[in-house]
Amino acid sequence: MNVILLEKVQNLGSLGEQVAVKSGFARNFLIPQGKAKPATKENIAEFEARRAELEKLAAEALASAQAVYEKMNGTVVTIESVAGDEGKLFGSIGTADIADALSKAGFDVERKNIRMPEGALRYVGTFEFDVELHSDVVASITVEVKATEE
């Protein structure tokens, strides 16, 4: 199925490109999320009429992501959790916990944008993670996990 991308989609293409994707991917993901439209003659004409507006919105989103990047990159957040004698946490710390800590630090981040390639944190220590603010802007943060006395 051919679709027109209405925004940049990672590993697929950028705004305005016509790409061939599997029909299920288009129907179940791209079209419902407003990232693409079927590449019909009517939709192509409508897109060309709105191209400048969509490019302006994309540029504004990139500019705001870069502004947040300037403030967030290198930020250190501390999360306290109950841990055993050897530093193993009772439970784990995941993306939701990191997103909460970032929101307390003044950053509005969705948990799906936090990249934890090795999964949830289960030990006390200092860890580095990436936060995808935009498909072109990725900030690096440091999370310090400290043990608390119950």
From Swiss-Prot:
Q: Which Pfam families match?
A: Ribosomal_L9_C, Ribosomal_L9_N
GO molecular function terms noted in the UniProt entry: rRNA binding; structural constituent of ribosome
Gene3D superfamilies attached to this UniProt entry = Ribosomal protein L9, C-terminal domain, Ribosomal protein L9, N-terminal domain
Instruction: Share an example GO biological-process annotation for this protein.
Output: translation
User: One GO term of the cellular component aspect?
Assistant: ribonucleoprotein complex
Q: Which keywords describe this protein according to UniProt?
A: Ribonucleoprotein, Ribosomal protein, RNA-binding, rRNA-binding
Q: Which PANTHER family match?
A: 50S RIBOSOMAL PROTEIN L9 (PTHR21368)
State the protein's purpose. Binds to the 23S rRNA.
| UniProt name for this protein | Large ribosomal subunit protein bL9
Source organism per entry reads Hydrogenovibrio crunogenus (strain DSM 25203 / XCL-2)
Q: Which gene encodes it?
A: rplI
